Design a protein with these regions (language model features):
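Carbohydrate transferase catalytic cores enriched for Leloir-type hexosyltransferases
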Residues: 1-372
Length: 372
């Protein structure tokens, strides 16, 4: 059985979609009778398959979303047929996907549909996604929240299976010693204590500005020495976020790192006093699990998939309520009993999310689809 995996739309492993694909490939265990093969941008020749016995087929397409969409619309069928795939997995269907399929197809959905449709072609893209999802054979939703969102858009619920993403427990685990005064994460030396939030500055729904305001309120109320570290690439909303940080009375205590390598988040989390995650558009919420796995308390939004993912291992707030966010920041620092409970529950919660299970369950779905 030959399974193709489409790496287009995964941002060269510099976003959540790219992290998904990189983690999937890294944790794939070769099995008899199954061959995986990736295809995508020539820029990704070594991005996902380095060190793995998995072939990568470069496709000569310009490195732009519109060019990749055109290729999927006009050329994907011929490519899939030429390479003899029995099935194809599409990890970024919200961004690039054929509108019809002549080979068995599985899409993996890691976000609610509407959050990816804020460009000039939103209406066309929404119709195209619906048409493609109607034609696809199987849909894997990374949370029940995503599954419910798909069903609300009229997608056949019988096509949908929920398979949770994993976290890399070889990377995210409690450190032995966090007693240093600084988190030494090259090229940064971040003074402790601090709160952290890892998210691209991509839009108002990520609630960076609300967090900055809440942090300012926390500082004013408690006079504690904490800093706020926001780690994520600049995006469409970066000017507004930088302006809010600059105008805060505690601007000198707010640090925006820009792009932050995924592997560096483990130390960023473990050396922090807590992960504060106010985003209201998370379909998966892996960052809160990664933070839990490093042994730090988590406070997050009470919306989207975060309550489903966190369970009883976090405290929740309304992301539009600045005082609630600030109060949660204070509680996980001042209330030792709460802090210790969140850490213990979080460590246990994180154990139930692993990539080995994600990969095995996904491949099983493809095998059943191909074999009938």
């Amino acid at each position: 059985m030959k399974i193709g995996i489409d790496s287009f739309g995964c941002d060269h492993a510099r976003s959540g979609l790219g992290t998904y694909l990189l983690s999937f490939i890294s944790n794939y265990q070769k099995e008899d009778g199954v061959t995986l093969e990736l295809f995508g941008s020539p820029l990704d020749k070594f991005t996902y398959t380095s060190g793995k016995d998995i072939k990568f087929i470069p496709v000569n397409v310009s490195d732009s979303l519109n060019a990749e969409r055109r290729w999927h619309y006009f050329s994907a069928h011929a490519f899939v047929k030429k390479h003899g795939y029995d099935a194809v997995i599409y990890p970024a269907p919200e961004r690039v996907l054929p509108v019809s399929f002549k080979t068995r197809s599985v899409v993996v959905v890691n976000s609610v549909i509407d959050t990816k449709l804020e460009d000039n072609f939103a209406y066309f893209t929404r119709k195209k996604i619906r048409k493609s999802f109607d034609a696809v054979d199987r849909i894997i939703a990374a949370s029940q929240f995503i599954a419910d969102d798909l069903i609300s858009h009229g997608i056949d619920k019988n096509k949908i299976t929920v398979i949770y993403n994993g976290i890399d427990h070889k990377l995210f685990y409690p450190p032995i010693d966090t007693s240093d005064d600084f988190a030494d994460i090259k090229p940064f030396a971040i003074r402790k204590p601090y709160f952290t939030y890892g998210s691209k500055l991509s839009g108002p729904e990520k609630k960076h500005i609300e967090l900055i305001k809440a942090f300012s309120l926390f500082k004013e109320k408690t006079k504690l020495p904490h800093r706020l570290v926001i780690s994520g690439s600049d995006g469409e909303y970066s000017d507004e976020v930088h302006k809010a940080a600059f105008e805060s009375p505690y601007a000198s205590e707010i640090f925006l790192t820009g792009f932050f390598p995924h592997e560096s988040f483990a130390k960023l989390y473990s050396d922090s006093d807590g992960c504060i995650f106010p985003s209201t558009v998370e379909g998966v919420g892996l960052p809160i699990l990664e933070a839990m796995a490093t042994g730090v308390p988590v406070a997050c939004s009470s919306s989207c998939a975060l309550p489903e993912i966190a369970g009883d291992s976090a405290i929740f707030f309304d992301s539009d309520n600045i005082e609630e966010i600030a109060n949660c920041m204070e509680r996980i620092v001042v209330d030792e009993g709460l802090k210790n409970t969140l850490i213990a529950n979080g460590l246990e919660r994180a154990k139930s999310f692993n990539w080995e299970n994600t990969v095995r369950q996904t491949i099983d779905i493809v095998k059943k689809l191909v074999n009938g």
